[in-house]
From Swiss-Prot:
[4Fe-4S] cluster binds at C20, C104, C201. Binds 1 [4Fe-4S] cluster per subunit. It catalyses: isopentenyl diphosphate + 2 oxidized [2Fe-2S]-[ferredoxin] + H2O = (2E)-4-hydroxy-3-methylbut-2-enyl diphosphate + 2 reduced [2Fe-2S]-[ferredoxin] + 2 H(+); dimethylallyl diphosphate + 2 oxidized [2Fe-2S]-[ferredoxin] + H2O = (2E)-4-hydroxy-3-methylbut-2-enyl diphosphate + 2 reduced [2Fe-2S]-[ferredoxin] + 2 H(+). Its cofactor is [4Fe-4S] cluster. It is an enzyme of class 1 (oxidoreductase). Catalyzes the conversion of 1-hydroxy-2-methyl-2-(E)-butenyl 4-diphosphate (HMBPP) into a mixture of isopentenyl diphosphate (IPP) and dimethylallyl diphosphate (DMAPP). Acts in the terminal step of the DOXP/MEP pathway for isoprenoid precursor biosynthesis. This is 4-hydroxy-3-methylbut-2-enyl diphosphate reductase. The keyword Iron-sulfur applies. The keyword Amino-acid biosynthesis does not apply.
Length: 313
C-alpha cells in the first residue's frame, strides 16, 4: 500500500461502535467508587473485557482480583458488568465486604427471567458460551435444573427431567444466527419450550447490524476489541459470514501491512468494551500509509444511559 497510489482509498467507520451503555455504566461505577471512597477499590474479575480499560482503571487505583478471599474485610468490592451468582453475593456479605453491583441492567433482566422460570418449576436452558462470566453468573442465580448449551450439536444431546416445563434464555452478546441454530433444535425436541423473543441486548444487535452494512461496502473489516470479548468476536464472525475478510485486533499494534494489499475500502468497528481512542489509533496508522478519505457511516442512534451503581445496603 503506497501513499503515492492514485487509487481512491477509503476508511469507513461503523455506527454505532465501541462502548455500550452497560460498559459505560460499569466504568463510571468504578471511577465514582474511587472518587467517593478513595483507593483501593477492589473489582471481582475484569469490570469489562478490554485490557486497555483495565490498565487505565488500575492506574487510577482499582485492584482487580479473581477471588473474593483476596479482598480485605470491610473493603469495597465491585461486581463486574457480566454479573455474578447468588453464591458470590452471599459469600461477599459473609466476608464483610461492602459491595457495589455494576452488572449491566440488561444482564440483570435476564437474571430476573431465569428466577421467574425457576419459580414456575421450569428447567432452564441458557444458550451461551461455557465458562463465560455472564453465563456463569446467570446460571448461578438459582439452584436446580439449569443447563448451558452452546451449539446445535449440544442441543441435540440435551437431556432434561421434565420436557413439558422447559424455558430458555440467552447470553446477551451472542450473534442472532448462532442462537437461531440452537433454537431450531430445541424447539423440535421440546415443543413446549418457553422463552423470550430475544435476550440479545440492543447494543449487541445494533453493532452486528452495522457490521453487516459495513461488509457490503468494504474490502476488509477491522474489529477493535480484546480476544476475550464475546461481542467483539461475534462482530468479527458476522463480518466473515458475509464473505468480507475481518480481523479482531487489540489495537493498531496488531495490524499487518499484508492485509491491505489491493484493499481500497477499509471498514472499522469496535466491540462494546473498546474505547474510541483505540479506533483513533488504527485510523492514524492507516493515514500514515495511504491517502484515505474517512466516512462515518449512518446507523442506529443510541441514547440510552444507565446511572452508575452505588453501595448495596
Amino acid at each position: 500500500m503506497s501513499s503515492e497510489s492514485d487509487k481512491k482509498l477509503e476508511i469507513r467507520l461503523a455506527s454505532p461502535r465501541g462502548f455500550c451503555a452497560g460498559v459505560e455504566r460499569a466504568i463510571e461505577t468504578v471511577k465514582l467508587a474511587l472518587k467517593e471512597h478513595g483507593e483501593p477499590v477492589y473489582v471481582l474479575h475484569e469490570i469489562v473485557h478490554n485490557r486497555h480499560v483495565i490498565d487505565n482503571l488500575r492506574q487510577g487505583g482499582a485492584v482487580f482480583v479473581e477471588e473474593l478471599e483476596q479482598i480485605p474485610a470491610g473493603a469495597i468490592c465491585i461486581f463486574s458488568a457480566h454479573g455474578v451468582s447468588l453464591q458470590i453475593e452471599k459469600r461477599a456479605k459473609a466476608l464483610g465486604l461492602k459491595t457495589i453491583d455494576a452488572t449491566c441492567p440488561l444482564v440483570s433482566s435476564v437474571h430476573r427471567m431465569v428466577e421467574k422460570y425457576h419459580a414456575e418449576g421450569c428447567s432452564v436452558v441458557i444458550i451461551g458460551h461455557h465458562r463465560h462470566p455472564e453465563v456463569e453468573g446467570t446460571a448461578g442465580r438459582v439452584t436446580g435444573e439449569v443447563y448451558v448449551v452452546a451449539t446445535a450439536a449440544e442441543a441435540e444431546k440435551l437431556q432434561v427431567n421434565n420436557s413439558e416445563k422447559i424455558a430458555f434464555v440467552t447470553q446477551t452478546t451472542l450473534a442472532e444466527n448462532d442462537i437461531e441454530q440452537v433454537l431450531v433444535v430445541l424447539r423440535r425436541r421440546f415443543p413446549l419450550l418457553q422463552g423470550p423473543k430475544s435476550n440479545i441486548c440492543f447494543a449487541t444487535q445494533n453493532r452486528q447490524n452495522a457490521v453487516r452494512t459495513l461488509a457490503r461496502c468494504t474490502d476488509l473489516i477491522l474489529v477493535v476489541g480484546s480476544k476475550n470479548s464475546s461481542n467483539s468476536n461475534r462482530l468479527r464472525e458476522v463480518g466473515t459470514e458475509t464473505g468480507t475478510p475481518a480481523y479482531l485486533i487489540d489495537d493498531f499494534k496488531d495490524l499487518k501491512e499484508s492485509w491491505f494489499r489491493g484493499c481500497e475500502r477499509v471498514g472499522i468497528t469496535a466491540g462494546a468494551s473498546a474505547p474510541e481512542s483505540l479506533v483513533e489509533g488504527v485510523v492514524v496508522w492507516l493515514l500514515k500509509r495511504g491517502r484515505y478519505e474517512i466516512t462515518e457511516m449512518t446507523g442506529q442512534q443510541e441514547k440510552v444511559h444507565f446511572k452508575a451503581a452505588s453501595l448495596i445496603d
